[in-house]
Amino acid sequence: MTVDILRGDIAALPSADRAVELLPAAEGDSLTLACASGELKSAYRVLRAVMDYGYAHERPARVRLVCADEDAYKAYSFQWNMWFAERKPEPENES
């Protein structure tokens, strides 16, 4: 399963808090969910649910997590990079 984390408009998207319910019902190869919370524990729970489902099922092959703001984006990106990413990003040099 591929997971994309990006920022964008979440107005018409289902909440990521419903991931456990929506993953089995996903039609096709992708599912897009809205991430509104910038809380690290919430981001971890959603990503853990997505990955646990992905380990056991072929579909959806891609999950897009659209974050409402910078705080949510940072929380989801941090948890993804910390626990799930195959390769860790290079540290940014603050020169």
Residue ranges with predicted function:
Residues 1-17:
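N-terminal beta-strand/alpha-helix entry module and adjacent surface
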Residues 15-95:
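Phosphate/ribose-phosphate-bearing ligand recognition and processing surfaces
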